[in-house]
Amino acid sequence: MESILTSIKKMLGIEAEYTHFDADIIMHINSVLMILNQLGVGPAEGFIIEDDTSTWSDFVPDETPVQLEAIKSYIYLKVKLLFDPPLSSSVIESYNRQISEFEWRLNVAVDPMPS
């Protein structure tokens, strides 16, 4: 399974070998992981990454591939807005709408269905 840091860097257009921004990106990833924890996604005790050794299966070992891809997209969008926000307000608004939809869908996915 791919490293969380490496895959988010790839989505941001940063080569895995380029480590100059790793501390900033890790901080933003951890902030988003905290938000996901509050939504009920991931380990109940929370989860942080410190380097490129933490993988997606460490964070969400039991998620379906579809849920995992939504989690990756959500983390990317949030980190993109924190680390390298677009200049256009319409693009920012589009990102925020996508983020809101992912939050709703991830919350529904982890909320137990009534019996």
Where are these regions (language model features)?
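Short loop/turn elements at secondary-structure junctions
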Residues: F59-S115
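Conserved short "hinge" loops at termini or chain/domain junctions
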Residues: M1-Q67, E103-S115
